[in-house]
């Protein structure tokens, strides 16, 4: 597996990242262990998790469960030094800390909790799961209204978080900082504040990106290239839509859609025609649709590392195979044509 630089962090990571959010709900600990074993054997040594995982659904009873499973794997298998481990502090919400925003205090509490569950003494990449001020992600862009009572307080909080993160870096508890579900303004402001106060610089951003969700392609892409801030693309298969398993608006037993019928707002009148078109494109070119979708994210004009999640070893094996696929100019041109027809199906 090829290794790539994670922006300006000094970290080298595998060109695919292993997603973990189903471990503890859709997947048992034994199944998660098997996935980590396979990933390690195949060189996928960049792993992403979060303190609030597992999802599908998120619940107070399962918070921290995925990190615990990963920590148990390290305890049994060893090899913490072989893995570049990313996790996240939960943003404001009811599940983890009862509507407390990300702050200096909650940052330290969250880091120390993750370290205990992960059974490690350091986190390679520590990410802010979503901004305190809200976000247009999670299908909120259709009604997004940026209204802020106190912009100065927003900036003060950001600086406070960076200072606290700097302390944690100095203590060796985290190595690098990253963003998630962030906006271009937010990323630019985090970078500006870090430069002004000589504080840790955000090195990456984890946002949704796939053939069906391409909000990153314009302003974000420009910032990514000019600031050397790679995208960690979550949902490169659009929560399984691009695999074809839901084609025809079906709900197969045991799938994510059985637990979340609308796939977090992704099931719309437009999405199935778009999915059908991309499945047809893959078929016409003799490609596996999942591998085509993942390979697409790796051939963008900005640095992009797709996060591949799976509920079975067969799915994981196939997704890892996308690292060996290079899409032809003809395939990319056909993708561009379909994107014009279906620019934002959800």
Question: What are these model-derived regions, one by one?
Answer:
Residues 28-39, 103-117, 158, 162-163, ...:
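Short, acidic/polar
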Residues 46-50, 84-88, 122-128, 178-181, ...:
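Short beta-strand segments at enzyme active-site cores
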Residues 20-30, 93-105, 148-156:
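Active-site mouth loops of central-metabolism enzymes
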Residues 131-337, 342:
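Beta/alpha (TIM)-barrel catalytic core signal, keyed to glycine-rich beta->alpha loops juxtaposed to Asp/Glu
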Residues 95-127, 208:
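Active-site gating/metal-coordination segments in enzymes
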Residues 55-61, 91-104, 134-146:
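Surface-exposed, active-site-proximal loop segments in enzymatic domains
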Residues 1-87, 104-108, 121:
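N-terminal binding-site loop/beta-alpha segment at the start of enzyme catalytic domains
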